[in-house]
Amino acid sequence: HATIRRQRQMCIRDRAETAKIVSPEKTVLHPSPDAGCSLSDSIEAGDVVRLKEENPGVPVVCYINTSAAVKAECDVCVTSSNYLRICERLPGDKLIFVPDKYMGRHLQQSLKGRKEVILYDGECEVHAEFTGPKIRNWKSSMAENGIDLVVLSHPECDSEVLDESDFVGSSELLMNEAIRLASVGKKDMMLITECGTADRVLAETEDNLNLMGACVMCRHMKKTQLEDILQALMDPTKDQIVDIPEDTIRRASRSLDEMFRLAE
């Protein structure tokens, strides 16, 4: 079989960059170069350098939603499904977590008494829309109508939201839990995350499901259209081809390699 030398990334910029870091020998296409990420855009490599200078010797953990340049300055990269496990395994009693302050606060609570977690002031504009009072009002309103609402939230939400939730997990875990709940007859639920997760749940289950409308659309993730993909595949422009300096790829790959090692 011929080796596939080209990848297309129908997503946000930092995911396309991550694909290039993992497969530097391949041409990676990003059909919508202006499809960024509010969380990734909240931090630059210089911000990480400053944090390291202020906290010498402290390991730096970055969320996957960061640029290649930021990953290159960090010790380990994490996802929403493995960040707790990986941070627990890091040596020492202190760590720096960037850029998501909400996920960082959840990490602080989970590691309380064991590790100090130094945070950065970044956030995802989608998950920042959800607040504790909003969730309480929704639950109260449903309860008045005899509906026992199950709330499933992404860890990028504020700690008040997570406190009001019945389940907290990555997009994949939220989807799996929603499908599991539907299979045992618990059909009334609310997914506190980007709308795409709810769409996937509805597409992948045949059980009766009543998803309350609380999701928020990500304007960046929804930018890419089928026409953009076709155009990029047929005749990509220079800015649609992901280009990262070799040194940045080399340094950023270390943080990803460390993630794979610690996640085992």
Residue ranges and their predicted role:
Residues 1-8, 12:
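Single conserved hydrophobic/aromatic residue that forms the stacking wall/gate
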Residues 6, 56-59, 92-95, 147-150, ...:
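Short active-site oxyanion
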Residues 9, 29-32, 60-64, 69-72, ...:
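General beta-strand structural signal in soluble alpha/beta enzymes
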Residues 16-54, 58-78:
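Active-site beta->alpha loop and helix N-cap motifs at the rims of alpha/beta catalytic domains
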Residues 29-55, 119-128, 213-226, 232:
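Long, charge-dense
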Residues 41-50, 69-90, 97-103, 119, ...:
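Active-site glycine-rich loop that binds ribose-phosphate moieties when present
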Residues 105-167, 171-182, 189, 197-211, ...:
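Redox- and metal-dependent alpha/beta enzyme cores, enriched for Fe-S-associated oxidoreductases
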Residues 155, 173, 193-205, 209-264:
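C-terminal functional extensions of proteins
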